[in-house]
Swiss-Prot record:
The lineage of its organism: Eukaryota, Fungi, Dikarya, Ascomycota, Pezizomycotina. It comes from Aspergillus aculeatus. PANTHER family: BLR1656 PROTEIN, PUTATIVE-RELATED. One of its GO terms (biological process) is cellulose catabolic process. Induction: By cellulosic materials and hemicelluloses. Transmembrane segments: none annotated. Keywords: Carbohydrate metabolism, Cellulose degradation, Glycosidase, Hydrolase, Polysaccharide degradation, Pyrrolidone carboxylic acid, Secreted, Signal. One of its GO terms (cellular component) is extracellular region. This is Endoglucanase-1.
Length: 237
């Protein structure tokens, strides 16, 4: 009987460490990280998506998201992600943004990307789901999907060659660094991307606050497919 109670307690503890997020904007917070199902574009097509949290603490996050979307071939349906809570500061005052991302997709016959998404704004109190500038780092893309705008350069950052794309979404200026082949294990300094933009494309680092830092996947169509993130962590220093 004691063994049964011990097993039951362990099972309960395991369940308590996880969360299943299926509502449109369901979130789970652990430590300095928040995981968001974030089905912001679901009305552009039809389908479903749920995100499972394996762990979230000050040490990092582990989670997965399973989706199946159809319709609206060129429209993003969601951005399930893990985001970092940090003290906002001017980009010019940031010394480094170390990060690690290890992930895998169980189905690559899809239209989707796997990407970092960061927003900056001149107003430190700007809403966190948009900005004056957006920086995306695409670690992978499948099915021929493309960032907003067009390619303007080939850049070398953090020892990796990237396609650099630029486009505008209303007044928001978006720079996207796109890996030519999937990077399923990434460890680097996101601040190096800001430094590149400041030095080569006039990014106003001294007047823009970093307000959002996230990592996740943008599905367009396809599935069922599951993105599994075995580890993601980041800090703003």
């Amino acid at each position: 009987m004691k063994a049964f109670h011990l097993l039951a307690a362990l099972a309960g503890a395991a369940v308590a460490q996880q969360a299943q997020l299926c509502d449109q904007y369901a979130t789970y917070t652990g430590g300095v990280y928040t995981i968001n199902n974030n089905l912001w574009g679901k009305d552009a097509g039809s389908g479903s998506q749920c995100t499972t949290v394996n762990s979230a603490s000050s040490a990092g996050t582990s989670w997965s998201t399973k989706w199946n979307w159809s319709g609206g071939e060129n429209s993003v349906k969601s951005y399930a992600n893990s985001g970092l809570t940090f003290n906002k500061k001017l980009v010019s005052q940031i010394s480094q943004i170390p990060t690690t991302a290890r992930w895998s997709y169980d189905n690559t016959g899809i239209r989707a990307d796997v990407a970092y998404d960061l927003f900056t704004a001149a107003d430190i109190n700007h809403v966190t789901w948009s900005g004056d500038y957006e920086l995306m780092i695409w670690l992978a893309r499948y099915g021929g999907v493309q960032p907003i705008g067009s390619q303007i350069a080939t850049a070398t950052v953090d020892g990796q060659t990237w396609e650099l794309w630029y486009g505008a979404n209303g007044s928001q200026k978006t720079y996207s660094f796109v890996a030519p082949t999937p990077i399923t294990s990434f460890q680097g300094d996101v601040n190096d991307f800001f430094k590149y933009l400041t030095q080569n494309h006039g990014f106003p680092a001294s007047s823009q606050y970093l307000i959002t830092l996230q990592f996740g996947t943008e599905p367009f169509t396809g599935g069922p497919a599951t993105l599994s993130v075995s580890n993601w962590s980041a800090s703003v220093q």
